[in-house]
Amino acid sequence: MNLKNKKILITGATGGIGNSLVKKFSDLGAKIIASGTNEQKLENIKKIYQNVQIEKFKLEEHQNIEKFIEKVFNDLGGLDILINNAGITLDNISIRLTEENWKKVLDINLTSSFLMCKFAIKKMLKQKFV
């Protein structure tokens, strides 16, 4: 698979899977924006990978997702691939999970992914990449 110079946004880039995705796509020559909420881990990514830009972004801020996608699109000069890798768990045992925490998990893990796709696809369609 040739991903050289493909423009990729990876959310949840500071976690284990996200970091592995950044490494793999970086090794394949992609242009990447790595997104997460942990500034120190984002800075570490920036130090390790020369072709990776970093952006701190909180996915629960739904009102800012469209602007975030616009910024990513402008910074990369387009967007070819969106990887919705970010997610949270608050308690692995459902009988202890409060309804409030359940809603927070759904909000970040599902609603944010939906909105990221919605706004990214709009940009991609204009590029004719979808």
Predicted regions mapped to residue ranges:
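Active-site loop of short-chain dehydrogenase/reductase
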Residues: 6, 78-79, 124-130
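Conserved glycine-rich cofactor-binding loop
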Residues: 14-15
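Conserved glycine-rich Rossmann-like NAD(P)H-binding loop of the short-chain dehydrogenase/reductase
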Residues: 28-43
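The beta1-alpha1 cofactor-binding region of Rossmann-like NAD(H)/NADP(H)-dependent oxidoreductases
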Residues: 56-67, 99
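Conserved NAD(P)H cofactor-binding loop of Rossmann-fold oxidoreductase domains
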Residues: 86-90
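Substrate-binding pocket helix/loop in short-chain dehydrogenase/reductase
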Residues: 93-94, 98-106
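A short, exposed helix-loop element centered on a Lys and neighboring polar residues
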Residues: 117-118
